[in-house]
Amino acid sequence: MEISRLSDRYTVLRMTEDHIAEVYALCRNNALYYHYCPPFVTEDSIASDMKALPPDKEYSDKYYLGYYEGEKLIAVMDLILRFPDKDTAFIGFFMTDISVQNAGIGSGIIGSLCAYLKDLGFSSIRLGWVKGNPQSEHFWKKNLFLETGVTYDTDGYTVVVANRKI
């Protein structure tokens, strides 16, 4: 995957440990997300997320991405290709900076992602949102993700699994 093709509007970088402070600065201002999906973010939790993989996946399929407008980090995405099957990409995490929310920027990023993944031969994108989080549910449904009917429980919350055909 050529990450530069994920957006024609923003600079997209593969995030590393050098970017943890920037990612933390973006995430810590999104208190509503962590109200529904505890615990609250820390630099250590970001470092852990940057390395987290589902069973039987390789790091070559994981892209922890930052979207920049100029020098400003405006969005973060954890994307895993070919999961849970070879035709599906999985968004493990997506968050925009609070200063750019409700302006169509997140939806634009997701639209560009869907178009590029379709060009690469993927047929769907899967993700989950925390049940009861109205902001997340509204955003993903607005972006054509449909509930699969599958949910699973974690410590403290339930995840609603959703899918979008591309």
Question: Which ranges hold each PLM region?
Answer:
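Active-site acidic-Proline motif in GNAT/NAT acetyltransferases
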Residues: 97-103, 131-132
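Conserved active-site alpha-helix within GNAT-family acetyltransferase domains
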Residues: 107, 131-149
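Conserved GNAT acetyl-CoA-binding A-motif
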Residues: 117-129
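Conserved beta-strand-loop-alpha-helix junction that forms the acyl-donor binding cleft
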Residues: 127-137, 154-157
